[in-house]
């Protein structure tokens, strides 16, 4: 937890203790949602379940404070990653209308010295365009990018990424130290 400040740890301890009803040093998965809400987060039930599964090694449904700190540290990193992803979206969205069109995607990829074939472009759009309107809105972009980021972190690849299902490697689309990966 080196990357958390003393103030953050104290704030998280205070929130944790508020919901540790019996003072045994653990909170239940249901209480976790309340704690996250008090810290300005609003995870869904599915997200809460996944968070608990990630940290609750014994499957008890309870989380100890150290596990809770790890969970919040990851959540804070993801929030920082969202800022990076928002910046990346702006790079792709040339006309700043809130959508990445096929032409904008092709243009940015060509400027990255990696032009897309029509099939690659179609694959990338298909993967990201969940509402089927032929373009990528910010929420679609965020969903794909965060999923890629989590996958890369789980695989131990840091901030690099890969493209769609065709396995062409590409990393750092928006800068050498960026968490941005190509769709």
From Swiss-Prot:
It is a lipid-anchor. Keywords: Calcium, Lipoprotein, Membrane, Metal-binding, Methylation, Palmitate, Prenylation, Repeat. It is found in: Membrane. Disulfide bonds: none annotated. Ca(2+) 4 binds at residues 129, 131, 133, 135, 140. GO terms for cellular component: cytoplasm; membrane. The modification Cysteine methyl ester is found at residue 180. One of its GO terms (molecular function) is enzyme regulator activity. SUPFAM superfamilies: EF-hand. A lipid is attached at residues 173-174 (S-palmitoyl cysteine). It holds the Pfam family EF-hand_7. Ca(2+) 3 binds at residues 93, 95, 97, 104. Ca(2+) 1 binds at residues 20, 22, 24, 26, 31. Residues 154-183 are annotated as: Disordered. Residues 181-183 form a propeptide. Its main location: membrane. Ca(2+) 2 binds at residues 56, 58, 60, 62, 67. PANTHER family: EF-HAND DOMAIN-CONTAINING PROTEIN, MYOSIN LIGHT CHAIN 1, 3. Belongs to the calmodulin family. Potential calcium sensor. This is Calmodulin-like protein 3.
